[in-house]
Amino acid sequence: MKITVIGAGHVGATAALRIAEKQLAREVVLIDIIEGIPQGKALDMYESGPVALFDTMVKGSNDYADSADSDIVLITAGLARKPGMSREDLLMKNTAIIKDVTTQVMRYSVNPILIMVSNPLDVMTFVAHTVSGLKPERVIGMAGVLDTARFRSFIAEALNVSMQDINAFVLGGHGDSMVPVVKYTNVAGIPLTELLPKETIDAIVERTKNGGIEIVNHLKTGSAFYAPAASAVEMIESIVKDRKRILPCTTCLGGQYGINNVFCGVPVKLGKEGVEQILEINLDDNELKALQASAAIVEKNCKSLASAI
C-alpha cells in the first residue's frame, strides 16, 4: 500500500505522521512545492519510527513522479482561510491549485482513490472528480467526519461524558449550510433530546457550524489541522482495512435525497473501493430542505467554475 499526501502544511504533515504511526501503508510520500519542506518533515517523521514503533517508509519530494502508483492520494494543498475569509472566498484561487494538483497526480497513478481536504471542500471534490476522470466513488471529501467530530466533542463537553459514547451525523456542505441531524444523535443509545434542553442543543449546533472559524479566530494566522488530519486518516483507515465504516463524507449523489449530480455530505459505507454505498436515511421536511439548500449552494458554486476547469 502506497499513500501520497499532497501539501506538507499542518494538515498534510500531521496526516502523514498519523498514517505512518498507524502503519496504514508501507510507503508514505509527502509532496509540496516548497523545496526542502517535505523532505525535512518526512525525514523527521521517519526518524521517529524507532520510538513510535512503526516501520513505514516516509519520503518527501517536490516531484509528482515520486507519487507514482499510489493507491490513495490525500490532497490538502491550497490556501488556508484567514480571519474574515469565507470558504467561498477561496473558490477561484483553490480551483486553479486543485486542477493542477489533480492533473499531476493522475499523470503518475492509474486508478487511485482521492481524499479531498482542500476548501471549499465540496466544490474542490467536484473539481478533482472532473479533472481526474475517476469514478465518483473514488473521489471523496473529508468534511462530514470533521464536522461530526466537532459536534460530538461539543456534546461530550456539555454532558461531561466520553466522546466515544456520542453518535451523530452532520450532513450537507462543509460550511455555514451544514446540517447537524439532532434526531439521529444519541449518547450510548439515549436520544440527545432527553439529556439536553433545546436551547443548549441549538447553541451546540450553531457552534458546530462555526467550528472552523472559531479556531481561525483564535490562531489569527492559520486554521485547524489536528482534527482535519485525524478525520482524513479515519477515512483512509476504513478504506485500507476495508472496514466498511459508516461515515458522513462528501460524495456525488445520484438522486438520493432528491439531489442529483452534486457533491454533498451524506452517510456512506467506506471500503477498499471507496464509497461502496450511499445511505439514504429518513429526514423530516425541515432537515431535507436544509440538506437540499446546502446542496444547491454547492451546485451554484460548481456551475460558476465551468470556464475554470
Curated annotation (Swiss-Prot):
Keywords: NAD, Oxidoreductase, Tricarboxylic acid cycle. Gene3D superfamilies: Lactate dehydrogenase/glycoside hydrolase, family 4, C-terminal (3.90.110.10), NAD(P)-binding Rossmann-like Domain (3.40.50.720). Pfam families: Ldh_1_C, Ldh_1_N. Its EC number is 1.1.1.37. It catalyses: (S)-malate + NAD(+) = oxaloacetate + NADH + H(+). It comes from the Bacteria. NAD(+) binds at residues 7-12, 32, 94, 117-119. The keyword NAD applies. GO terms for biological process: lactate metabolic process; tricarboxylic acid cycle. GO terms for molecular function: L-lactate dehydrogenase activity; L-malate dehydrogenase (NAD+) activity. The active site is at 174 (proton acceptor). Substrate binds at residues 81, 87, 119, 150. Catalyzes the reversible oxidation of malate to oxaloacetate. PANTHER family: L-2-HYDROXYCARBOXYLATE DEHYDROGENASE (NAD(P)(+)) (PTHR43128), L-LACTATE DEHYDROGENASE (PTHR43128:SF16). NCBIfam families: MalateDH_bact, PRK06223.1. Belongs to the LDH/MDH superfamily. MDH type 3 family. This is Malate dehydrogenase.
